[in-house]
Amino acid sequence: MIVYNVTCNVAPEIEKRWLEWIDHQLYNLSKSEKISATSILKLNTNSSENEAVYALQYQIYNRDSLQSFLNNEDQVLKKQINTVFGKSVLHFSSQLQNIKKYP
């Protein structure tokens, strides 16, 4: 299982609107046969700034599914984020491999 993570730094003034928007987008993406699960996580920060940092996580079955996801759904979603929110949402991606899961 591969975990694909997109970390998003969201400007405070658009956080509520972005969260509603991304929730709808991920709900639709979660129906993909490439993805076994999706999650929206919020990072707990001790920062005095009102920054909001979220992690969008996708559990993807295998490398082929990941590559297809990266070439299609991921590019579309990131383009939409940039179009709708511009520089109010900054994001970067990382890939993690699940080595072992404990009960």
Stretch-by-stretch model annotation:
Residues 23, 57-60, 96, 101:
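Generic alpha-helical hydrophobic packing signal
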Residues 39-49, 80-103:
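Glycine-rich beta-strand-turn "strand-cap" elements at beta-sheet edges
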Residues 14-40, 76-79:
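Short amphipathic alpha-helical segments
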Residues 14, 64-66, 102:
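Residue-level signal for secondary-structure boundary sites
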Residues 2-9, 41-72:
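Short, well-ordered beta-strand segments in beta-rich or mixed alpha/beta enzyme
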Residues 11-14, 95:
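Intrinsically disordered, low-complexity regions enriched in Ser/Pro/Gly/Gln/His and often acidic
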Residues 32-36, 59-94:
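An amphipathic, aromatic/His-enriched active-site/gating alpha helix that lines ligand/cofactor pockets
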